[in-house]
């Protein structure tokens, strides 16, 4: 029987992700429109975004946070190009974005002393093979495969190389041991549903030391430069961005952080995300035609949740189109490079009731197209 209720918000995209419940464009009226980002009010707004982010995540006091251009991609690229090359590199690959980082390191930077550990979709490489005398590059959560690292236990507290982690679909949704990460990047448009084009960069003291003691052999474009005269450009981490940010997008980020504070902060964001995943765990347990792409529960993502469905690719496309036409689910097809299936965002801005409702519609559509 066709469901009678529909999700209040049918946006289940894995990026840009759904706006938080109660979102209003009116919340952005305090943005310093028409003012320079280097003016006092402009810089204060950017510094506020940095401080609220730091406080929400509970970062170590000696870690630095900055706003940088070009989303998570820009943030991570600037670190790869600025920091790698002075020692060997181990890269972990198990989905599209981690594969792109490996391509950058081996084909663009052409670092010969590089080991790539690759696993197919749904699996993780063997983490025990990683050598922390090398710099280690990995994603915390594979956004296109629905597979995450189980925890940080495989990373030693004492290590010679740096750990560079793309955590864009993990921050604000998963427990992350920051002291095990030297570089951590993310974008605004993932777990908290902010706007695109801006990245955030978090550096440990060890990462700063690398920047100040090592100069790559290749030229760096302006938007990748984190140092001036061999010293860290600390102004970047105080609200003085490398180039012009969108003050509207920054105001939107402030609004999302205020919402996150209002629902109980980081602990509650993680709980909301886990409760959302539990909806699908119950749904998969009840239906033998839908399966998690992640092979085991301990590596199953709680944000970008990926599924295999017992349908042909043609029938699956029909199911996805049907749900879109009914205006109950947008953008839930698997990533273009991933195995055919569904990918449904379960981060903190998604309401559990909407996912429960979506499950009814998926079941209805499956019965029609199978």
UniProtKB/Swiss-Prot annotation:
User: Which UniProt keywords are listed?
Assistant: Amino-acid biosynthesis, Aminotransferase, Cytoplasm, Pyridoxal phosphate, Pyridoxine biosynthesis, Serine biosynthesis, Transferase
Q: In which pathway does it act?
A: Amino-acid biosynthesis; L-serine biosynthesis; L-serine from 3-phospho-D-glycerate: step 2/3; Cofactor biosynthesis; pyridoxine 5'-phosphate biosynthesis; pyridoxine 5'-phosphate from D-erythrose 4-phosphate: step 3/5
Q: Which residues carry this modification: N6-(pyridoxal phosphate)lysine?
A: 190
Q: Has keyword Transmembrane?
A: no
GO cellular component term, pick one: cytoplasm
According to UniProt, the reaction catalysed is: O-phospho-L-serine + 2-oxoglutarate = 3-phosphooxypyruvate + L-glutamate; 4-(phosphooxy)-L-threonine + 2-oxoglutarate = (R)-3-hydroxy-2-oxo-4-phosphooxybutanoate + L-glutamate
Q: How is the cofactor bound?
A: Binds 1 pyridoxal phosphate per subunit.
Q: Which domain of life is it from?
A: Archaea
Which cofactors go with this protein?
pyridoxal 5'-phosphate
Q: Does the keyword Transferase apply?
A: yes
Cellular location(s): Cytoplasm
Recorded GO terms, molecular function? O-phospho-L-serine:2-oxoglutarate aminotransferase activity; pyridoxal phosphate binding
Which cysteines share a disulfide bond?
none
Which residues bind L-glutamate per the record?
38
Gene Ontology biological process: L-serine biosynthetic process; pyridoxine biosynthetic process
Q: What is its EC number?
A: 2.6.1.52
EC class of this enzyme? Answer: transferase
Positions that bind pyridoxal 5'-phosphate: 101, 143, 166, 189, 243-244
- What's the family? Belongs to the class-V pyridoxal-phosphate-dependent aminotransferase family. SerC subfamily.
Q: How does it assemble?
A: Homodimer.
- Its biological function? Catalyzes the reversible conversion of 3-phosphohydroxypyruvate to phosphoserine and of 3-hydroxy-2-oxo-4-phosphonooxybutanoate to phosphohydroxythreonine.
**Protein name, UniProt field:** Phosphoserine aminotransferase
């Amino acid at each position: 029987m066709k469901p009678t209720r529909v999700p209040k918000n049918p946006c289940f995209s894995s990026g840009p992700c759904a706006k938080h419940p109660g979102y209003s464009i009116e919340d952005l009226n305090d943005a310093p429109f028409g003012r320079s980002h280097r003016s006092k009010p402009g810089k204060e707004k950017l510094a506020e975004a940095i401080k609220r982010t730091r406080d929400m995540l509970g970062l170590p006091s000696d870690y630095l946070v900055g706003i940088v251009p070009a989303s998570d991609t820009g943030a991570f690229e600037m670190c790869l190009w600025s920091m790698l090359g002075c020692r060997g590199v181990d890269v972990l690959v198990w989905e599209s974005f981690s594969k792109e980082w490996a391509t950058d390191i081996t084909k663009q930077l052409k670092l010969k002393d590089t080991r790539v550990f690759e696993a197919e979709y749904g699996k993780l490489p063997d983490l025990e093979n990683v050598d922390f005398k090398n710099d280690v590059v990995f994603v915390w959560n594979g956004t296109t495969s629905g597979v995450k690292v189980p925890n940080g236990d495989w990373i030693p507290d004492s290590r010679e190389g740096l750990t560079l982690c793309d955590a864009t679909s993990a921050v604000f949704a998963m427990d992350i041991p920051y002291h095990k990460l030297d570089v951590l990047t993310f974008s605004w448009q993932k777990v908290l549903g902010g706007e695109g084009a801006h990245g955030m960069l978090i550096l440990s003291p060890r990462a700063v030391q690398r920047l100040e003691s090592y100069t790559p052999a290749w030229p760096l474009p302006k938007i990748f430069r984190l140092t001036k005269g061999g010293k860290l450009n600390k102004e970047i981490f105080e609200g003085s961005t490398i180039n012009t940010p969108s003050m509207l997008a920054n105001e939107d980020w402030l609004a999302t952080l205020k919402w996150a504070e209002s629902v109980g902060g980081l602990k509650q964001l993680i709980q909301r995300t886990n409760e959302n995943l539990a909806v699908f765990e119950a749904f998969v347990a009840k239906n033998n035609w839908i399966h998690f792409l992640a092979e085991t529960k301990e590596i199953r993502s709680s944000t970008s949740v990926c599924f295999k469905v017992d349908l042909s690719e043609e029938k699956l496309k029909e199911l996805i189109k049907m749900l879109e036409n009914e205006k109950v689910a947008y953008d839930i097809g698997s990533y273009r490079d991933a195995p055919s299936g569904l990918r449904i965002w379960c981060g903190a801005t998604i309401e559990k009731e909407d996912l429960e409702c979506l499950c009814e519609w998926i079941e209805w559509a499956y019965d029609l197209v199978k």
